[in-house]
Amino acid sequence: GLLDVVGNLLGGLGL
């Protein structure tokens, strides 16, 4: 879902 995408982006940024 949308939150899954947000989590993926944050994970990619190392946040």
Curated annotation (Swiss-Prot):
This is Caeridin-2. One of its GO terms (biological process) is defense response. The modification Leucine amide is found at L15. It comes from Ranoidea gilleni. Caeridins show neither neuropeptide activity nor antibiotic activity. The keyword Secreted applies. The keyword Cytoplasm does not apply. It comes from the Eukaryota.
